[in-house]
């Protein structure tokens, strides 16, 4: 089967069903934080829905802690000083809970262990989670997404293809990203940077 024909079949099926999910790994690796590139890490796959593109290798199984905000109520929470901060802190707390239940963090000590050292401190009943726990420990990957975009547009009588919809999209996601990065900076000062992100000022 010629590659062009296969590609056309994939695109046609995607247009009809929404699947299969298609991921450009070269683009994912271009967007990987420089700190992780410097460690020789690489994205080789995504999860099924393709919203998680994290490095995996013989020592790591990708772990990402996800939540979402409801954009339908954006006007109600956009001016809150704490809303996004609280979401980021909650996600970091969930990761910390996973790490602490998987690893003897007191015995492990300093917060920058190699895999060979780390695996010796994984709790006996969590040995099957060693690579996942190490990934969580090193990267502290979180994702704060959004739902309710169309609901916001409907509630405010905004046409989906209008410039107003495009403007809202940019405004909402810029707000979320700006507040999320600021929250991660604050957490890095309070709790320390993720080992993979040393020097970035980021916790997640």
Residue ranges: model-predicted function:
Residues 139-146:
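Aromatic-lined, polymer-binding surfaces characteristic
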Residues 198-203:
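Acidic, glycine-enriched catalytic cores built around paired aspartates
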């Amino acid at each position: 089967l010629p590659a062009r024909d296969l590609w056309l079949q994939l695109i046609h099926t995607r247009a009809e069903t929404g699947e299969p999910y298609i991921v450009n790994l070269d683009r994912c690796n271009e967007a990987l934080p420089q700190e992780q590139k410097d460690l020789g890490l690489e994205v080789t796959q995504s999860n099924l829905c393709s919203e998680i593109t994290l490095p995996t290798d013989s020592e790591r199984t990708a772990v990402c802690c996800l939540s979402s905000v409801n954009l339908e109520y954006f006007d109600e929470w956009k001016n809150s000083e704490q809303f996004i901060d609280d979401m980021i802190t909650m996600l970091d707390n969930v990761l910390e809970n996973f790490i602490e239940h998987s690893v003897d963090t007191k015995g492990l000590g300093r917060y920058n262990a190699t895999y060979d050292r780390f695996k010796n401190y994984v709790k006996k009943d969590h040995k099957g989670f060693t690579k996942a726990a190490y990934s969580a420990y090193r990267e502290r990957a979180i994702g704060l997404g959004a739902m309710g975009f169309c609901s916001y547009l409907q509630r405010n009588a905004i046409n989906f293809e209008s410039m107003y919809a495009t403007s809202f999209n940019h405004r909402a996601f810029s707000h979320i990203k700006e507040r999320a990065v600021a929250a991660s900076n604050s957490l890095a000062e309070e709790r320390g940077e993720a080992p993979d992100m040393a020097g970035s000022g980021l916790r997640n």
